[in-house]
């Protein structure tokens, strides 16, 4: 599920569900091309990123979605409405590491793992030199909501800046969900009871995760 902004040329939030991957799940070939999304009024295309100095960064990850949901779902991760500008040093290093950990380490700990992710912007934003219609985020967030077999809910959140170093420890970028909400303007766990929501959103507890 994607919440897309035509004004920023970015997905503002993306939600996907992870479950423990099956050992015999097929590893699908990565699609060759990114595709424009006809629902996008600005019709951002892959060429908007050409020679921009930024990678076409997936929010819903190609590998995990392909592994769990198959080829058609994988191809949807290559729609430009799932793509945001990421520095190569982020996209191909620490962000990729976080995507690997969420699938291989976090998901097996829970019955179901929900992931909320998206870009964060400064008040004064710049756009790609190759496209006036695509704003450049200064950071990205990930919120994990894990449902245990007992029914207990565990949460974890990160904000990772564009200039994060490849060998940084992920724990360096741990934040509360409250902090993600403050910077994004979104209310992520509003469907929960208010007391439970308040308690989960202010905590930074890695006990069930690392």
Give the ranges of each region predicted by the language model:
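Short, His- and charge-rich active-site/binding loops that engage polyanionic ligands
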Residues: 1-56
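Domain-level detector of nuclease and nuclease-like folds
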Residues: 38-210
């Amino acid at each position: 599920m994607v919440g897309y902004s035509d004004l920023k040329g970015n997905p503002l939030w993306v939600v996907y569900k992870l479950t423990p991957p099956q050992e015999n799940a097929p590893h699908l070939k990565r699609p060759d091309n990114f595709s424009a999304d006809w629902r996008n009024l600005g019709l951002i295309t892959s060429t908007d990123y050409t020679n921009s100095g930024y990678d076409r960064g997936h929010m819903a990850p190609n590998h995990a979605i392909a592994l769990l949901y198959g080829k058609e779902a994988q191809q949807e991760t290559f729609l430009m409405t799932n793509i945001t500008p990421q520095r190569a040093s982020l996209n191909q290093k620490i962000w990729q590491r976080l995507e690997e950990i969420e699938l291989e380490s976090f998901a097996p700990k829970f019955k179901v793992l929900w992931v909320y992710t998206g870009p964060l912007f400064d008040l004064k934003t710049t756009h790609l030199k190759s496209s006036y219609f695509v704003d450049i985020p200064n950071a990205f967030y990930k919120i994990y909501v894990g449902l245990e077999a007992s029914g207990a809910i565990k949460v974890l959140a990160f904000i990772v800046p564009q200039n994060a170093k490849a060998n940084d420890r992920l724990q360096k970028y741990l934040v509360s969900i409250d902090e993600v909400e403050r910077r994004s303007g979104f209310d992520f766990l509003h469907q929960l009871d208010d007391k439970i929501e308040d308690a989960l959103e202010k905590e930074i507890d890695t006990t069930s995760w690392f």
